[in-house]
Each structure stands twice: as structure tokens, then as C-alpha cells.
A protein has these predicted regions:
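A short pre-motif secondary-structure segment
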Residues: 41-45
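Flexible coil/turn residues that form the inter-helical turn or adjacent wing/linker of helix-turn-helix
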Residues: 48-49, 54
Length: 88
């Protein structure tokens, strides 16, 4: 059985002029369920390691808006990931 372990296919996202590779296919699918803006914020925060203040400046939005959108996106990602786990 261990010889037939399926490997995830890395998926590339473009954000802030950079290519971000998400190695987990499940996470990538969950990210695709987010609005483009929320996905952008999550990728900038956790893959490009930008702070909320930096993201806010790039998007021309208040830091509080970025923080709210980030938290809402994380909650939505958690829900999507749980749905996928339940389907397995």
C-alpha cells in the first residue's frame, strides 16, 4: 500500500507580481473557494510573509479591513478543509 501513495500536485497562484506555489492540492482547492481578494491576502500574508500593514499599503485598503478579510478567509478555509475531510 505504501508504494501507491498519491502525491499532491503543486498549484501556482499569481499574487503581487509573484508566483506562489501551494504544495497541498487540498489547500489549493480550498483557496480557490475564496474570493480573489481574500485569496490574495492569505497568499501575501502566509506565503510572501507580508505584514497586514504592508498588504494594506499594496491594496490601498485600511489595515483593519485587511485584518478582517484575513480572519474571514481563515475561517472560510477551515470550513472548506473540513468539508473536504468529511468527503474522504
Amino acid at each position: 500500500d505504501e508504494y501507491f501513495i498519491l502525491q499532491d500536485k503543486p498549484i501556482a497562484f499569481e499574487v503581487n507580481g509573484q508566483t506562489v506555489i501551494v504544495d497541498s492540492e487540498k489547500l489549493a482547492k480550498a483557496l480557490l473557494c475564496l474570493s480573489e481578494r481574500r485569496r490574495e491576502i492569505i497568499l501575501m500574508r502566509y506565503y510572501l510573509q507580508l505584514r497586514d500593514r504592508q498588504i494594506a499599503a499594496l491594496l490601498g485598503k485600511p489595515r483593519t479591513t485587511v485584518n478582517y478579510q484575513k480572519n474571514a478567509a481563515l475561517k472560510q478555509l477551515r470550513t472548506e478543509m473540513e468539508k473536504m475531510n468529511d468527503e474522504e
